[in-house]
Regions:
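Short conserved beta-strand segments at catalytic cores or DNA/RNA-binding microdomains
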Residues: 1-12, 24
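Acidic/histidine-rich catalytic cores and adjacent linkers
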Residues: 4, 25-56, 60, 64-67, ...
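Structural motif
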Residues: 16-24
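Short alpha-helix plus adjacent loop in nuclease-associated cores
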Residues: 66-87
Length: 244
């Protein structure tokens, strides 16, 4: 079919050398030179492929993958606190019931039930979630600080600003993350150190990897409807006929 939003290529594997050779053989330099922007996740191999094949294009790290790295670090803090609490409970006198808070839950329950709430904006919280998080933040301020920075990062990505302005705001945000001094943010710090230019490229045109992620979802649904894939070549053939 061709046109906007269609599948251009389906290549097995993630080995950069193999994929680079396939793409360069399929497209001449004049075609590849026309590509101005490539969005991808934080995979080093995907970034290498994009920069080697489409040498004239800006490589952009998908903002949602960047936010996911930070959100995972926040969740690791929650898990660590809960793990310590469970260890303390195991060493405590079992005849004494655990403390319940004003919402009727124990801290162990509050921590377990806050996972998804900590990924949401405050304006989307229900009253039950709001009460739960109020207690959580009161007794574990590190989670409040981490959550506040998660929302600040989201606001930066949502802002209609230039890459230069974004760099200034990101630098201040990064300093705040460093100031928390929590080991769970090592992956976040490493990500921003290694990928700062490609993360900031998002603010050129605000392109995301959403279309590719949506296509992945379609493939998974299609695969489940077929109850799995026995003949891979025929499955790829059908995908090409449907989406190419």
């Amino acid at each position: 079919h061709g046109g906007k939003g269609t599948l251009a290529a389906a290549i097995p594997g993630t080995k950069s050398d193999e994929i680079i050779s396939i793409l360069t053989a399929a497209m001449g330099k004049s075609v590849r030179r026309k590509v101005k922007e490539v969005t991808c996740d934080l995979s080093p191999s995907m970034m290498l492929i994009a920069s080697e094949v489409f040498y004239n294009a800006h490589v952009v790290n998908d903002r949602f993958h960047v936010q996911q790295v930070y959100n995972e670090a926040v969740d690791e803090i929650r898990i660590d606190i809960r793990r310590r609490l469970i260890a303390e409970e195991n060493n405590r006198d079992k005849s004494v019931p655990p403390k319940t808070y004003s919402n009727g839950e124990t801290m162990r329950q509050i921590l377990a039930r806050s996972k998804h709430t900590l990924m949401m904006s405050q304006n989307k919280w229900s009253e039950i979630q709001r009460h739960r998080v109020y207690i959580l933040f009161k007794y574990h301020p590190i989670l409040k600080s981490a959550y506040t920075l998660a929302m600040e990062l989201r606001r930066i990505f949502n802002a209609q600003i230039s890459p230069t302005k974004a760099m200034s705001r990101m630098s201040k945000w990064y300093e705040k993350v460093m100031a928390l001094g929590n080991n769970n943010f090592r992956s976040v710090i490493k990500t921003f150190k290694n990928h700062a230019p490609t993360i900031l490229n998002y603010f050129r045109r605000r392109a995301t990897n959403a279309s590719a992620e949506a296509f992945n979802s379609k493939v998974k649904i299609f695969r489940s409807q077929m109850r799995g894939v026995r003949d891979r070549d025929f499955f790829i053939f059908r995908l090409v006929k449907l989406y190419a």
